[in-house]
């Protein structure tokens, strides 16, 4: 089983440090991750950089759902654990993952149709809008990686683990440095690459890796060891909470 910190015992200062420092490093590497994308887009053109910024604006609206999911799951699971109700904590973890899957699929469908309309709303016709459209359509497929990873991180934080997300984001940053040029420019004599959309492809792979790692960490939690597959069937009462 994975290491976990019990937030119901011990000094508050220790718990603040346990949660805050890894979270701060995770945010740092998220910023650096985006800097890498901007840098490689700049190797193509300023239109590519503008398209990156505009396409990501539309995507961020969808990604914000992940922040809400993280806060909700962290609160619900933490309250259940704090009250000593292991069964309720398990139910919130399982149903939280199920809800995350449902909301992710919904956001992908909604984003596919409404995202381009948002891009049109904030841009003028031109090369940078075309770049933003292509980038956004590809980036939609990274949405599960973002939403389920952030939602899952809320579950891990409720168990005192904010290190897993930090490590995952650090690894994603390093992977992004290598994946961006690979997908943008390809391999000489083998593959010509995807151009600007290669940035989105690199994001899909690296963020999906983050999601897989976070889910693996969740399923190694003690609370998940007795879970049956039928427990993941969506429950309306749990979803309402």
Where are these regions (language model features)?
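Short alpha-helical transmembrane segments in multi-pass integral membrane proteins
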Residues: 1-23, 77-144, 189-241
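Hydrophobic/aromatic residues in alpha-helical transmembrane segments
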Residues: 21, 36-37, 73-74, 114-115, ...
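Residue-level hotspots within pore-lining transmembrane alpha-helices
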Residues: 25, 29, 33, 62-66, ...
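Small-residue-rich hydrophobic transmembrane alpha-helices
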Residues: 49-109, 146-165
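Hydrophobic transmembrane alpha-helices of multi-pass small-molecule transporters
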Residues: 61-64, 108, 176-180, 211-215
């Amino acid at each position: 089983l994975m290491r976990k910190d019990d937030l119901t015992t011990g000094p508050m200062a220790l718990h603040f440090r346990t949660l805050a420092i890894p979270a701060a490093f995770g945010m740092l590497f998220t910023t650096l991750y985006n800097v890498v994308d901007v840098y490689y887009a700049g190797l193509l053109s300023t239109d590519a950089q503008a398209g990156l910024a505009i396409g990501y604006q539309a995507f961020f609206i969808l990604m914000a759902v992940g922040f809400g999911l993280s806060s909700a799951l962290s609160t619900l699971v933490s309250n259940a654990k704090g009250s000593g109700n292991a069964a309720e904590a398990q139910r919130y973890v399982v149903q939280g993952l199920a809800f995350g899957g449902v909301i992710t699929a919904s956001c992908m469908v909604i984003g596919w149709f409404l995202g381009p309309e948002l891009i049109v709303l904030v841009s003028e016709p031109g090369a940078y809008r075309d770049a933003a459209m292509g980038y956004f359509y590809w980036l939609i497929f990274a949405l599960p990686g973002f939403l389920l990873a952030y939602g899952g991180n809320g579950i891990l934080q409720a168990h005192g683990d904010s290190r897993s997300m930090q490590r995952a984001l650090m690894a994603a940053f390093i992977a992004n440095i290598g994946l961006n040029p690979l997908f943008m420019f390809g391999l000489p004599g083998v593959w010509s690459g995807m151009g600007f959309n290669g940035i989105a492809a690199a994001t899909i792979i690296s963020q999906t890796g983050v999601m897989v790692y976070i889910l693996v960490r969740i399923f190694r939690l003690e609370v998940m060891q007795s879970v049956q597959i039928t427990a993941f069937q969506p429950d309306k009462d749990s979803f309402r909470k």
